[in-house]
Amino acid sequence: MASQSQGIQQLLQAEKRAAEKVADARKRKARRLKQAKEEAQMEVEQYRREREHEFQSKQQAAMGSQGNLSAEVEQATRRQVQGMQSSQQRNRERVLAQLLGMVCDVRPQVHPNYRISA
């Protein structure tokens, strides 16, 4: 009877050690999973920062060149407007004289399609 009781005790102790080993293995697995998850999260975060930085640099390059283009277009527009204004000032008197001459110098003529019926 004592041997049976001793055998049962050994079995219980072995079962307890096995349960402890299984619990330890589960804890190690949980720690490894948690560590892997944290590492993956860090990698994702680093990749996201790299892509964001790349996007910002491309956007800055595009907007920078666009800003230069708008400044160039604005400057060219100002030059054209100034050219038109100076041309208007130079030709104003001549155009007015020509226009008044056409309006005031009336030469009556019979229209070519007019038929004299008599």
From Swiss-Prot:
Residues 35-56 have a biased composition (Basic and acidic residues). GO terms for biological process: regulation of macroautophagy; synaptic vesicle lumen acidification. Residues 25-90 are annotated as: Disordered. One of its GO terms (molecular function) is ATP hydrolysis activity. It is a peripheral membrane protein. Brain. Subunit of the V1 complex of vacuolar(H+)-ATPase (V-ATPase), a multisubunit enzyme composed of a peripheral complex (V1) that hydrolyzes ATP and a membrane integral complex (V0) that translocates protons. V-ATPase is responsible for acidifying and maintaining the pH of intracellular compartments and in some cell types, is targeted to the plasma membrane, where it is responsible for acidifying the extracellular environment. V-ATPase is a heteromultimeric enzyme made up of two complexes: the ATP-hydrolytic V1 complex and the proton translocation V0 complex. The V1 complex consists of three catalytic AB heterodimers that form a heterohexamer, three peripheral stalks each consisting of EG heterodimers, one central rotor including subunits D and F, and the regulatory subunits C and H. The proton translocation complex V0 consists of the proton transport subunit a, a ring of proteolipid subunits c9c'', rotary subunit d, subunits e and f, and the accessory subunits ATP6AP1/Ac45 and ATP6AP2/PRR. Belongs to the V-ATPase G subunit family. This is V-type proton ATPase subunit G 2. It comes from Homo sapiens.
